[in-house]
Amino acid sequence: MQDRVERVTRYIDNVMANTEGTRAEGVYVVSVALKGRAGQQKLEVLVDSDKGIAVEQCAWVSRRILEKLEEDDEPLSEEIAIEVSSPGLGTPLQLPRQYYRHLGKLLHVRYRTPEGAEAEIEGYLQEAQLDGVNGGDSADSVIVLKPKVQGKRPRNAQPLENIRLPLSRIIKAVPEAEL
């Protein structure tokens, strides 16, 4: 099955390398997963862009992947359902680049403190300083969160300070809906 995932990933990489000037320009792959068992497999491709993604862009990517699969001299042994979609609300961020799209939005972040303990914070993403190749692979990459105020605060309370978190300490960051 791993061989199939690698082959399909190559098709997807080929499709995504040729999006300039198309509906899918600026779209990038977040994750690829082949799910199910033989005869009932589904290829799940999550895509995103720095400005958000439209249904038409997902459809374009899906059609191009299907074309690549059909062009192959060595077709996959069975039919595979293809599902191309964007990461939904509540889906953990998987790539550093995704932080840009969530600037100003509420995130629930689980992270490691400098002492190694796990901690959580809910806050608004104020800044994403992503250094390095592919927007954030460097140890210097950080995000800045403004903590969400829980309940009513006393009138004379000091304002909460922004928190800087290195990406290397983030275990999981999930965009949250604000009600």
Swiss-Prot record:
Required for maturation of 30S ribosomal subunits. Belongs to the RimP family. This is Ribosome maturation factor RimP. It comes from the Bacteria. The keyword Iron-sulfur does not apply. It is found in: Cytoplasm. Keywords: Cytoplasm, Ribosome biogenesis. InterPro entries: Ribosome_maturation_RimP, RimP_N, RimP_N_sf. The gene is rimP. The keyword Cytoplasm applies. Gene3D superfamilies: RimP-like superfamily, N-terminal. HAMAP family: RimP. GO terms for cellular component: cytosol. GO terms for biological process: ribosomal small subunit assembly; translation. It comes from Chlorobium chlorochromatii (strain CaD3).
